[in-house]
Regions:
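Short S/T/G/P-rich N-terminal loop/turn motif that feeds into the first structured element of a domain
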Residues: 1-49, 55-69, 76-107
Length: 107
């Protein structure tokens, strides 16, 4: 069963958040390329929710060293003032209109 990791991050400023998002775009495929889906949502001027889906807990655990490194970088370089995450089994998924989703960044 696929699992989701939902990370919440609160930044000191909107500029810090944007810089962190730009940094994440440059490393996502190399550091977290085994994620099945990644969706980042700006939930406020200085807050971000990141949803990453993995095929299993074991698959997600392979990213733990890079996840820690990423968290350390964003806390030091991009002034994250708070960060926490949840994880759990995905119990429902529907994506029939996934092709219609538009984003600020293109992969």
């Amino acid at each position: 069963m696929s699992i989701a990791i939902i990370t919440m991050m609160e930044y000191l400023s909107d500029k810090e958040m944007a810089a962190s998002e730009n940094f994440y775009q440059t490393i996502q495929k190399e550091w977290f390329g085994n994620a099945q889906i990644v969706i980042n949502v700006r939930t406020g001027p200085t807050s971000l929710l990141s949803l990453a889906v993995y095929s299993s807990y074991e698959d997600a655990e392979t990213n733990l060293p890079k996840r820690k490194e990423f968290q350390d970088i964003v806390k030091d370089k991009f002034t994250v003032v708070d960060s926490f995450y949840y994880e759990g089994d995905i119990t429902y998924f529907e994506a029939s209109k996934a092709a219609e989703i538009t984003t600020e960044w293109k992969t």
